[in-house]
Amino acid sequence: MKPKILLLLATLCCSFPIWGQKENFSYKFYGFVRADLFYNTRATMAPVDGNFYLYPLDKLPDAEGKDINAGPNGSFYTFTTRLGLDIKGPHVGTAMTSAKVETDFGGFSKNVALLRIRQAYVALDWEKHQLLIGQTWHPLFGAVFPDILNLSTGAPFQPFNRSPQLRYQYQTKEITLTASAIWQMQYTSSGPDGMSEDYMKNSCVPEFYVGADWQHDNEWIAGAGAHLISLSPRKQSEWEGNIYKVNERMTTTSYEAHIKYTGTNFTVAAKTLLASALDHTALLGGYGIHSVDPQNGKQEYTAFRQSTSWINFTYGQKWKPALFIGYTKNLGTGQSLADTETLYGMGLDIDQLLITNLNLSYNLPHWQFGFEGSVGTAWYGDVNARNGRVENTHQVTNFRILGLMMYYF
């Protein structure tokens, strides 16, 4: 009896590799182990338990006028460790098929140690056409982004977002045209109930992006794009003791342009945006209430506009120094604000934000060690209801130091 059982177990074990393989499929695992050690001289806006650094927080005086936010903070984390799988499958007609599944632990929830989806999509690729279905990088992130060590990858100057989308691209040797319809999941807009995907869900209108890129000889990349977002902040209002069904909508557009040059041993990259209500992409921005209907409390909205730009220089390969400079200016709202206390977004009381970042990394096959120093200054003030601009400003500054170790596989 025992020999028969052993034979059956051996047969099953030998069968597992056969079951695990699919004809005309190939699989490639990749990822890294990442460790971040950081220190700040004051409190910061930094999701993911302080790893995703954005900007210094405003002064918070106590009863004696002492700034509560002036104290230092720091920690050491490894939860942004990543694992991914690239899949190539059989042709569908004349189209090549592929898929990607990518995960890590560095989400924006209160418990960042939980596994989450970074990317999960399938793609159909013809010679000049590609259709992508699933979650991947927001098209505003694009092909041009900073090469820095901080996890935020240039935010809040560089859009940072991965979302479910339908993306079509038309490609020639040097030109790529992109059109995307994007929905929200992990990175969500602000509104009356905080950050939520419900504002887009109730809107029934996804984000839209169209853009064009020019690439030449693996040296130059240049392009531009336009983005539209339309939210439904509320479905009902509470007005003078009654509840009313309302149909509210906030719609606005943003524009971006980018360029990058890759030389023999250096790179220069830059991006600029006229951004409106892009707080879900980790940029400063949002919207406020323009007017209130006295009959039922229905609200009209107006979006804040920000001019944001960054430039990035890198040199070398094994030893690689890099410089990053980012700047944002609050341009106010298109219409007046009915209430400056009820605003939805991030950093709407900041007039200007300037961050300078200098880093040095040592790169080996499968290894990276780096050190980064960052100086960030934010000019906080009062929002003017007439035009949404920030006045009577004062500045706060944070010095951030980051140590990084990464092992790639």
Regions found by a protein language model. Give the residues of each.
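Bacterial Sec-dependent N-terminal signal peptides
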Residues: 1-22
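Outer-membrane beta-barrel proteins
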Residues: 16, 84-92, 126-128, 169-174, ...
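Outer membrane beta-barrel
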Residues: 22-49, 59-61, 65-187, 204-205, ...
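Membrane-spanning beta-strands of outer-membrane beta-barrel proteins
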Residues: 78, 115, 161, 205-207, ...
